[in-house]
Amino acid sequence: MRINPTTSGSEVSTVEKKNLGRIVKIIGPVLDVAFPPGKMPNIYNALVVQGRDNEQTNVTCEVQQLLGNNRVRAVAMSDTDGLMRGMEVSDTGAPISVPVGGSTLGRIFNVLGQPVDNLGPVDTNTTSPIHRSAPAFIQLDTKLSIFETGIKVVDLLAPYRRGGKIGLFGGAGVGKTVLIMELINNIAKAHGGVSVFGGVGERTREGNDLYLEMKESGVINEENIPESKVALVYGQMNEPPGARMRVGLTALTMAEYFRDVNEQDVLLFIDNIFRFVQAGSEVSALLGRMPSAVGYQPTLSTEMGSLQERITSTKEGSITSIQAVYVPADDLTDPAPATTFAHLDATTVLSRGLAAKGIYPAVDPLDSTSTMLQPRIVGEEHYETAQRVKQTLQRYKELQDIIAILGLDELSEEDRLTVARARKIERFLSQPFFVAEVFTGSPGKYVGLAETIRGFQLILSGELDGLPEQAFYLVGNIDEATAKAMNLKT
């Protein structure tokens, strides 16, 4: 991994002899800059606009095109208000570089790696460029292994792959943020890992809410910031398209350092991957490229691949990525989600219906899928248990119309037993979270995969048919459910 040791930890690497150009054209966030003959900067180099009297205006741009006639076209990473033709632009000689390492934990950064949380400068002298190639084949760890989350519904029915990519589908208010925070908490405790959250084109309010909730739940430790378990990188929807297009790479670069240098398991959240594509589409239009299908950029697959292929397991560690996916107009054939799906190993679908019932986490057990749920990967016992759970829930779903019209009494004895077990399974799929202790009062539970399988096998076998279904609601393992049933009887 290429690391730039610097003395200041600034957002761009500096070179001794400045290569200076001048702005000749400004169109919104796009600048055309003329350089002296033979001094053209490379593609992806960071340029810094100099203010009058050598004052920096703090506008950093990234070279996107070499136009000929000693001119380059660059995209700004912040607002271009106040810029004028003739202003000096200095070529830094390197791509945008951002701080990396343990001192990034508990902090909020923008696309340039500058802290935006008013907690002072980042205590590090190590930076890394945001553009790099994916790991070579020889470095990859091709072994298929399950990434245990300690969340029953995920581990049993749609297990995550270590170093894989997971799509998280959910609307507002169904518990997406709480699920994200629980995953961050569990990876820190069970795997000794850290997390990086990349807010790509999201609402400023949502980013602020997530930060405050993380502080409240202890994921970010206010008293001792370095003890925190997550670094946050935000490029909000009010920022120029250049910033929104590159903020995912900034977050990924921080995650890669933890994987390659610290040799840790890293969880990388990207919310929302669609906004990354959308920003790329805006930049593509500004650069004058001919649009492709549905108005998207012609380089859609390449841009998505350059991000996704860097998210992988190596011999040193792993980056497991959870990406929120917005589906425009619920059209799964839209080029943006369709391109994303090609890279996903699992999908976790959050259901408003389950959230309305109070089943948390509100993960839909029938809609969520995983390529890992195969007997040769998870073993026969896990696979058979998961399939029987899904069959029971599917049968219950089919019977719900009959129950609504005629009532339970009209069902056959076998169907009534199926419904009773399905309702127990549905409730047993709920679980108290560590990060929700603050407002539920129930201590959180981490349930290992073996315990999860044992619990569902006992429900399916009929051994627990005599227990009331409310005993299975918001408990950890099956022993807690039986103990709760005893308390309900007394």
Curated annotation (Swiss-Prot):
Matching PANTHER family: ATP SYNTHASE, ATP SYNTHASE SUBUNIT BETA, MITOCHONDRIAL
Binding-site positions, ATP: G170, G171, A172, G173, V174, G175, K176, T177
UniProt main location, coarse: plastid
Keyword Thylakoid: yes
Family the entry assigns: Belongs to the ATPase alpha/beta chains family.
UniProt keyword annotations, A-Z: ATP synthesis, ATP-binding, CF(1), Chloroplast, Hydrogen ion transport, Ion transport, Membrane, Nucleotide-binding, Plastid, Thylakoid, Translocase, Transport
Compartments, as annotated in UniProt: Plastid, Chloroplast thylakoid membrane
Species of provenance: Ipomoea aquatica (Water spinach)
Protein name: ATP synthase subunit beta, chloroplastic
Pfam families: ATP-synt_ab, ATP-synt_ab_N, ATP-synt_VA_C
Subunit: F-type ATPases have 2 components, CF(1) - the catalytic core - and CF(0) - the membrane proton channel. CF(1) has five subunits: alpha(3), beta(3), gamma(1), delta(1), epsilon(1). CF(0) has four main subunits: a(1), b(1), b'(1) and c(9-12).
Matching InterPro entries: AAA+_ATPase, ATP-synt_VA_C, ATP_synth_F1_bsu, ATPase_a/bsu_AS, ATPase_alpha/beta_chains, ATPase_F1/V1/A1_a/bsu_N, ATPase_F1/V1/A1_a/bsu_N_sf, ATPase_F1/V1/A1_a/bsu_nucl-bd
E.C. number(s) listed in UniProt: 7.1.2.2
Role: Produces ATP from ADP in the presence of a proton gradient across the membrane. The catalytic sites are hosted primarily by the beta subunits.
GO-annotated molecular function: ATP binding; ATP hydrolysis activity; proton-transporting ATP synthase activity, rotational mechanism
Membrane topology of the entry: Peripheral membrane protein
Entry's Gene Ontology BP terms: proton motive force-driven mitochondrial ATP synthesis
GO cellular component: chloroplast thylakoid membrane; mitochondrion; proton-transporting ATP synthase complex
Catalytic activities: ATP + H2O + 4 H(+)(in) = ADP + phosphate + 5 H(+)(out)
